[in-house]
Swiss-Prot record:
NCBIfam families assigned: rplB_bact (TIGR01171)
Gene3D superfamilies reported for this sequence: 2.30.30.30, Nucleic acid-binding proteins, Ribosomal protein L2, domain 3
Keywords assigned by UniProt, alphabetized: Ribonucleoprotein, Ribosomal protein, RNA-binding, rRNA-binding
GO molecular function: rRNA binding; structural constituent of ribosome; transferase activity
Biased composition (Basic and acidic residues): 229-239
Subunit structure: Part of the 50S ribosomal subunit. Forms a bridge to the 30S subunit in the 70S ribosome.
Function, in words: One of the primary rRNA binding proteins. Required for association of the 30S and 50S subunits to form the 70S ribosome, for tRNA binding and peptide bond formation. It has been suggested to have peptidyltransferase activity; this is somewhat controversial. Makes several contacts with the 16S rRNA in the 70S ribosome.
Organism domain of life: Bacteria
Protein name: Large ribosomal subunit protein uL2
Annotated SMART domains: Ribosomal_L2, Ribosomal_L2_C
Species assigned in the record: Aeromonas hydrophila subsp. hydrophila (strain ATCC 7966 / DSM 30187 / BCRC 13018 / CCUG 14551 / JCM 1027 / KCTC 2358 / NCIMB 9240 / NCTC 8049)
Name of the gene this protein is made from: rplB
C-alpha cells in the first residue's frame, strides 16, 4: 500500500493524493458474481428528484459480496484481492473446497493464498467468521450481524472495526467506531480483524470532476438560492434570519430524528457527537 501525491502538472492534478495497492488483481472481476447496476439519477418512477446531488458517473457492475458467511465447515482459500467501485473496502475472491467461489470483504492483513473458514468451530484468526458467543471478549471484529442469519450490517467500511466489550447471557456488548455501545445477540456472526484499506481516508480527489465520475453532483448552499427555492434564500446580505433548516423546513441542527424506540433498550450509550 502506497500513498502517491501527484505532481502539479495541471490544476486538476495539483491536489490529487492516490492510494496505490500493488496487491490488487489487475484483471477483470469474476463474471458469475457480477450483477447489473442501474442508475436512477436520484429520481423515482414518476421522474421526480427524490434524492438530490445524484447523477452521471462511470458505468459500474455490482459485486455480489457474501455477508452471511454461512458455508460452515468447508475450508476456503483466498485466490486474489480486488477493487470494488461500490464500497470503500477492497474485496477478496475465495475458493471453497467444494468448488464454489464467493466474494468477501478483505480484512487487514489478508492476502492471496491464505486459508479462511467459518462456523462455530473456526479458529480465532483474521478472516474467519464465528458466532460472537465463541469469540473472546476484547477481540476486534468487523462485518457484524444485527440479527442472526441476516448478514453483516455493522463495520463494513474501509478501516472500521468493532470491539467486543462483554458477554452476558444471550447478548454481547459491542463498542462501535462512532463511540456507541450497544447489545447484540451472541448468536450473531462477526469476522475476526478489521476491514482493510484503512488508508482510504487519506486520499484526495483533487478536483470537482472526480466526484462527477463517482456520480455525485454539486451541492448548492441554501443561502445562495432564491426564497422560492429554499427557506434560507433571499434577503439582504448574508444572513439566514432563522434557525438552520432543510429545504423542506425540518430543523438541521439538534433536531432528534431517531424514531425506532423499539430498539432503544439495546443501546447502552449513545454515540459521540
Amino acid at each position: 500500500m502506497a500513498i502517491v501525491k501527484c505532481k502539479p502538472t495541471s490544476p486538476g492534478r495539483r491536489h490529487v493524493v492516490k492510494i496505490v495497492n500493488q496487491d490488487l488483481y489487475k484483471g477483470k472481476p469474476f463474471a458469475a458474481l457480477l450483477d447489473k447496476k442501474d442508475k436512477s439519477g436520484g429520481r423515482n418512477n414518476n421522474g421526480r428528484i427524490t434524492t438530490r446531488h445524484i447523477g452521471g458517473g462511470h458505468k459500474q457492475h455490482y459485486r455480489i459480496v457474501d455477508f452471511k458467511r454461512d458455508k460452515d465447515g468447508i475450508p476456503a482459500k483466498v485466490e486474489r484481492l480486488e477493487y470494488d467501485p461500490n464500497r470503500t473496502a477492497n474485496i477478496a475472491l475465495v475458493l471453497y473446497a467444494d468448488g464454489e467461489r464467493r466474494y468477501i470483504l478483505a480484512p487487514k492483513g489478508l492476502k492471496a493464498g491464505d486459508a479462511i473458514a467459518s462456523g462455530a468451530d473456526a479458529a480465532i484468526k483474521v478472516g474467519n467468521t464465528l458466532p460472537m458467543r465463541n469469540i473472546p471478549v476484547g477481540s476486534t471484529v468487523h462485518a457484524v450481524e444485527m440479527k442472526p442469519g441476516k448478514g453483516a450490517q455493522l463495520a463494513r467500511s474501509a478501516g472500521t472495526f468493532i470491539q467486543i466489550l462483554a458477554r452476558e447471557g444471550n447478548y454481547v456488548t459491542l463498542r462501535l467506531r462512532s463511540g456507541e455501545v450497544r447489545k447484540v445477540l451472541a448468536e450473531c456472526r462477526a469476522t475476526i480483524g478489521e476491514v482493510g484499506n484503512s488508508e482510504h481516508m487519506l486520499r484526495q480527489l483533487g478536483k470537482a470532476g472526480a466526484n462527477r465520475w463517482r456520480g455525485i453532483r454539486p451541492t448548492v448552499r441554501g443561502m445562495a438560492m432564491n426564497p422560492v427555492d429554499h427557506p434560507h434564500g433571499g434577503g439582504e446580505g448574508r444572513n439566514k434570519g432563522m434557525q438552520p433548516v432543510s429545504p423542506w423546513g425540518q430543523k438541521a441542527k439538534g433536531f432528534k430524528t431517531r424514531k425506532n424506540k423499539r430498539t432503544d433498550k439495546y443501546i447502552v450509550r449513545r454515540r459521540n457527537k
